[in-house]
């Protein structure tokens, strides 16, 4: 029985979305146990499950605008910190939160702790492609700076994830660069390229450009945290802007446009669901001793349930354990 | 009378699109003269204008897959190199090409030459926002690496451009970063932030995130060439993927969806035209002694004409001359 510690107080719709997501997941999976950290009375308002679930009460919580490292240090009894400590103490196998991302990164780093020989855990998400398979990208912003060796470790971690959690055999690894030729990029990219090309255990397919990401050009895309963050936010911002404009065009387009939209409803819905990658779960801070997963602050119960499913798969396939074994071989850098 | 040198042989639809764009521009503007470089017989097939236009014949051209610097050095009689040389010799005031971007950057850098005290010219484009005003971003990839001082110069250049060419008073300058707080980012961002904040001649509004770019959060956005290239390609790739998926959903959605799309036609067209920023012209390699402008390889006559309009505005407002004056004050770095 795998145990997942849930920060029930983080996110825009806490605790309702978290607790209802927990209800769903407990129905769907008989082999998990959930521990909910937060305000017991409020949690009980929404909790319908009665087996394999427990509540650890606390009044304290971390807010979305708290300074991350300070919050972790000062709010020792917050729902997020208690959830992370449960993993540290061996009382839970993984943490899920929809709260303050920076604080969760800090909690993961300082409380759960890094895998030996991994200097800089990276933030990994599965992002959508037009054909639906998706791709895993990291680092999406856990770090503001990375070395070539970090990126090399991300290629390994991303490959483990794509293979274990998404079932992709010999995942194709691409290095995000400003052109596809092997000579492209700044010194960081050139050095990373050499490291990736030299390791035959990786299925390295060379440089990939941001324009091709949604076309499924690679299964795993590695980049530094600064660029990854900018690319992720560009994709999100563009998708939101276009969908918003489409809606505006329809609403401002008179009766004809509205009738057209009504007839197109199913097609538009299908488009939206293809672009919506919340089914793939949340963002994993990968490189820690246990899964620490952030789901969107705006997550609803369904997304929370998907994220619990993702964590369950990570635990069942022991992707973290495999990483520990692999990186223990590395000489300390 | 301003003279614009046009590489008539570069781009997917050369020379037709270039020559037809020239025809249109000559009709629209009575105060410009165009010099077309390329295959005279082919150019004449499409040339309808007879005044203020001349052809300089050459058989040589640079291909899209030529190695840029080598091509510039070896193909001395190519249409692109001859156009750049005409500017260098004072026979033309600006260059336009739809050909090999890298080669045009090299031609700009080595033939047209940099403005004194500008180390690294940057690639600037006007990109779309949902409200239609757009924003200017640089560097979009002329450089793989930049220093804080380069980014500071881009803020000045971008401000000149937005004010002169787009008529925006005291343009708001944002620094692309991985968060809006002033303490965010890697050392490059932190150092750039200090430089921008210390210069009261700039209307610096602080850090901006990639997610907000299309919402018009700033008029000028500065970043290093690697990140700018990744962000530009992410925006383009996402927009193309979504529009492609929308089309696919409609085509695969049966009669109902097709009828809906027919009724929505005007709204979808309006959406497309809002996202299409070819009206704003091409990408300017800014920081050179004359306007060197790249229009998309796939540009049609209308886009070529828009780019000629853009160059005409740059020449009439003397945005390059203003930059020369401004940067001549700087101590050599």
Swiss-Prot record, chains A, B:
Enzyme Commission number: 2.3.1.274
Keywords: Cytoplasm, Lipid biosynthesis, Lipid metabolism, Phospholipid biosynthesis, Phospholipid metabolism, Transferase
Major subcellular location class: cytoplasm
Locations listed in the record: Cytoplasm
Key word Repressor present: no
GO biological process: fatty acid biosynthetic process; phospholipid biosynthetic process
Alphabetized SUPFAM superfamilies for the sequence: Isocitrate/Isopropylmalate dehydrogenase-like
Domain of life per record: Bacteria
Top EC group: transferase
GO molecular function, one term: phosphate:acyl-[acyl carrier protein] acyltransferase activity
InterPro entries listed in its UniProt record: FA_synthesis, Phospholipid_synth_PlsX-like
Keyword Glycosyltransferase: no
GO cellular component annotations of the record: cytoplasm
Pathway: Lipid metabolism; phospholipid metabolism
Reaction catalyzed: a fatty acyl-[ACP] + phosphate = an acyl phosphate + holo-[ACP]
Listed Pfam families: FA_synthesis
Family: Belongs to the PlsX family.
NCBIfam families, per database record: plsX
Subunit structure: Homodimer. Probably interacts with PlsY.
PANTHER family documented for this protein: FATTY ACID/PHOSPHOLIPID SYNTHESIS PROTEIN PLSX, PHOSPHATE ACYLTRANSFERASE
Designated name of the protein: Phosphate acyltransferase
Organism: Streptococcus gordonii (strain Challis / ATCC 35105 / BCRC 15272 / CH1 / DL1 / V288)
Organism taxonomic ancestry: Bacteria, Bacillati, Bacillota, Bacilli, Lactobacillales
Gene name in the database record: plsX
């Amino acid at each position: 029985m795998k145990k997942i510690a849930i920060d029930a107080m983080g996110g825009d719709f806490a605790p309702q979305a978290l607790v209802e997501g927990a209800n769903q997941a407990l129905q769907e999976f008989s082999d998990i146990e959930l521990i909910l950290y937060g305000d017991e009375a409020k949690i009980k308002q929404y909790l319908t499950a009665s087996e394999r679930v427990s509540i650890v009460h606390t009044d304290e919580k971390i807010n979305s605008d708290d300074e991350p490292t300070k919050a972790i240090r000062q709010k020792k009894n917050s729902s997020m910190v208690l959830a992370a400590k449960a993993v540290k103490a061996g009382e839970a196998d993984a943490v899920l939160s929809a709260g303050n991302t920076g604080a969760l990164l800090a909690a993961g780093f300082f409380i759960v702790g890094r895998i030996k020989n991994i200097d800089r855990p990276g933030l990994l998400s599965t992002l959508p492609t037009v054909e639906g398979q998706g791709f895993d990208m990291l680092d999406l912003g856990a770090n503001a700076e990375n070395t070539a060796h970090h990126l090399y470790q991300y290629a390994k971690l991303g490959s483990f994830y794509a293979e274990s959690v998404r079932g992709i055999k010999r995942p194709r690894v691409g290095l995000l660069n400003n052109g596809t030729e092997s000579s492209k990029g700044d010194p960081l990219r050139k050095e990373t390229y050499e490291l990736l090309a030299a390791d035959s255990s990786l299925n390295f397919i060379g440089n990939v450009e941001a324009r091709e990401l949604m076309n499924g050009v690679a299964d795993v895309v590695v980049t530094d945290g600064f660029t990854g963050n900018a690319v992720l936010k560009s994709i999100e911002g563009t998708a939101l802007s276009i969908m918003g404009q489409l809606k505006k065009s329809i609403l401002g387009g008179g009766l004809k446009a509205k009738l057209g939209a009504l007839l197109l409803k199913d097609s538009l819905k299908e488009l939206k669901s293809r672009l919506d990658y919340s089914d793939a779960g949340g963002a994993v801070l990968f490189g820690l001793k246990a899964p620490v997963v952030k789901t969107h602050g705006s997550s609803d119960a369904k997304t929370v349930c998907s994220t619990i499913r993702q964590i369950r798969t990570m635990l069942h396939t022991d992707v973290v354990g495999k990483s520990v074994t692999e990186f223990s071989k590395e000489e300390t850098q």
